[in-house]
Amino acid sequence: MSSLFYATTPTVNAQSDLQTIKYRNLVIDLGNGIKTNARLNLPAIGDGPFPAVLLVHGSGPNDMNETGGYVRIDNETGSIIYPPARPFFDIAEYLSERGFAVLQYDKRGIGANFTILDSNVWGNATFDDLTQDAERALDVLVQQPEVDSNNVTLVGHSEGTTIVSRVAINNPGIVDNIVMMGAFAQNLREIGDFQGVSLPILYAQQVLDHNHNGLISVQEASENPVFSSLVGNLTLVLAQNITTVNGTAEQLNPQYNINNDTFISIIDELKHKLIDQLKSLSVVTQGEKCSGLKEPCPIWLTSHFSSIPNLDIISKVPSDISILILQGKNDSQTPIQQAFLLQQKLTEVRHPDHTLITYPDLGHSFYPSSQWLTGIGPIQEYVLQDLFGWLSDPVRGFTKVTILSSSSQMR
């Protein structure tokens, strides 16, 4: 595997007067004329070689920081205001300050602030493309003079957890550890069913069905911000027939449904509409461009549906590659059961060194969250401490199976 890259001179990270990090901007050649920007984060002092970490994104049009929100300029002070969530920036900064070389890269077709630079490249990206991109990034990482190529870790978040396991299998002589944060065990089809059907139905049953009769008010559901975040525009989801309070059938008029007393059946109507909506996402319309900002790109989605589940892939990771799984118990995108399934599979195949750490109040971004929605903010420091501690553990490499529940109160 050979990847071309273009480098600039290392630059000190100008965030304070006393610098602890320097970095080098790179351009990675992904093949077929496609290039992407990357950044190598290094300790400010020393030439290495440093243990290396590659960060592999979750789904969607992610830049190298996995930015959740937009960078903007304060009109009064002129200072840069960063968005509340930049999980890969948090990881890169924390680890490089503590002696690691960390490589981040933008997804193909994507630039800073998850800007789509090339809609054709991004809209036609497949799961295999993204896996190959991670392989190219790994190739570039181990070529850097400051990197210890005998100590390489892959950190995947969400969709990235399905990629790092594959890259590890393909590069057994290079990869030493993999870390899975907010992990996939099942195929994205099952993950999508949880996000788009099971979770909204559970919310409707537990929160909106006040009379416990299996019916919810269209008006209340439409005005509920959590439910709207889960299902989108309820009027569009429902489409046609609905059931009123007295049991008669009415035609839902999208223009007026917010102001009437219409009720719908959670199981007989809402669930079927949510299933139909989920199926429609994977329909590929010839010539239609996809941004992936609101809905997933159909080409990417269908490529995922045909992929082998991570639960089957993980069992093939070589026994000398250590595995860490970090999981928030309030993850509303990849529920904690996914992490338990991976841990059970690793135990079944007798993988000698795997660890699962769960966090009671954290969501998919490892920030405090409810069980329904992902809170947006910086990764909690105790998660970063756990990650660094595991990577720095001198006794790893011996037979070690660990399941921990961690919280800020334990610190």
Give each language-model segment a name.
Residues 45-49, 53-94:
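Short, surface-exposed "cap/lid" segments of acyl-processing enzymes
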Residues 122-144:
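Alpha/beta-hydrolase active-site loop
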Residues 181-316:
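Accessory cap/linker subdomain of secreted extracellular hydrolases
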Residues 12-48:
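N-terminal cap/lid segment of alpha/beta-hydrolase-fold proteins
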Residues 140-146, 150-197:
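Primarily recognizes the serine-hydrolase "nucleophile elbow" in alpha/beta-hydrolase
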Residues 362-366, 371-407:
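Catalytic active-site module of serine/aspartate enzymes centered on a nucleophile-bearing elbow/loop
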Residues 325-327, 331:
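Short beta-strand/loop motif that positions the catalytic acidic residue
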